Amino acid sequence: MQQAPSGYSYPMATTVLPAHAVANLMGNDVAAVLTATDIVMGQLTAELRGARAGDVVDLVASNGAVLQFTIAKVVPDEISGGTELLLSIEAAERLGVTRESRMVLWGFDSRASLDAELIRQNLISTSIRVRRSWDPPDPDATLGMAQTKAALGEFAYRVNTNGSVSIDSTWKNANISAGSIGQLSLRSGCHNLVRAALTNAMNEVIASGLEYTINYFHANTAGGCYVPRFNRLTPNSSIGFLSRHTWGQAVDTNTVGSCQGCAPPDMDCRTVRIFRKHGFAWGGNFLTPDGMHFEWVGKRRDVGLYPSRYCGNTNAGSLAALDGESERSTIFADDGLYVGDH
C-alpha cells in the first residue's frame, strides 16, 4: 500500500474523456471498463507503485472529500496517450471536475483539409494549443508527469492555506541540493540530476564564449530552479496543476528580454541549442513564449529538424531515434502539469 503522510497527497495526472472518445482513441476494451467508480491507469504509473487491476485509489475531490475508485485496467502508455489516470465523465463529476478544456477530433478524411479549416476558423494561434498525433518530435516538448516521476521521483505535497506548497521532507532531502553552479546561485536548490546537466550546459556555454548571453542578475534574483507552486483549477479547489519547478526541474535566466509572453525572446539561439544538447527543452517555443525557461527532459534535444517558431535546430539527425516515442503516445501526457509555467 502506498500512503501519503497525513495531510499530504500524491500528484496524479488525470485525463477525462467521454466513452465514445475513449472507444475511438484507445479501443472499446478500454472504454468498456470505465464507470463512475472504475478508472484506468497507465502502465508506467502502475509500475512506479506496484499497482494492478483491482487495487483501490483514493482521490481528493474539489471540495476536499476523499473518494475511492477501483483500477479496472492497466494499459500501455502508448494506448493511454501518456496520462496516469483515465476517468469517465461520470467519475469526474463525482470529483467536482466539470470544466471542459479540450476538444479531440478523429475520423476526418484529410489532414490537409483539417489544417485548412483550423486556419479558416482562426484556431491556429498562441492562445490555443493544437496537437496532432502525426506531428514530428518537437525538441521543446516537455516530460509528462509519469515520465517526470520515473526520472526525478515522486513526492507527496500539501497546498497550504496561503497558497504555498509544502513537499514531503524525505523526497526533498534526497533529491534537492542548494549551492551555486558558477555564477548561478540557485539558493533555493535544484534536483540533483538537473544540477549535473545544468553544470554541463553552463560549462559549454562558457567554453563557447557565450557566457554574456546569460543574465546572472535576473537568474539570481527573479529566476530559480526549485520553487514549489500550485495553480488551482478554481479558487479554494484541491484540484489544479503543479509547476515543474516543484521538482527542481527547470531554471529561469533572462527574465526581462525573454519573459513569459515576450516574442520574440532575446535568448541567443546558440545558447538555446547548447542547453538542448544537454537535455533541456526551451520555453521560447511554448504556446505562450517563455524564453527564460529551460526545462530538464534528460535527453538530447539539439538533434532533428523541426519547424520551431524560434531557434530551430540546425542538426538534421533524427530526434525520433533518440526519443523512441511518438506524439500519439504522449498526446495526454501533459495533463496534470501546468504547461508553460515559469
Predicted regions mapped to residue ranges:
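Basic-flanked hydrophobic alpha-helices used for secretion and membrane insertion
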Residues: M1-P137
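Stable alpha-helical elements in mature extracytoplasmic
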Residues: P18, S88, C190, V194-A201, ...
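Second-shell loop/turn segments in exported
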Residues: A32-A36, G81, S180-N192, I239-G240, ...
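Solvent-exposed, polar/charged alpha-helical surfaces in well-ordered, non-transmembrane soluble domains
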Residues: E47, D55, A196-T199, N203, ...
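N-terminal low-complexity, Pro/Thr/Ser-rich intrinsically disordered segments
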Residues: W134-G163, L319-L322, I331-F332, Y338
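Active-site acidic/histidine clusters and adjacent loop/turn architecture
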Residues: A151-N215
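Active-site-adjacent loop/helix surface patches within enzyme catalytic domains
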Residues: M202-Q249, A281
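Catalytic cores and adjacent binding grooves of peptidoglycan-active enzymes
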Residues: S238-H342
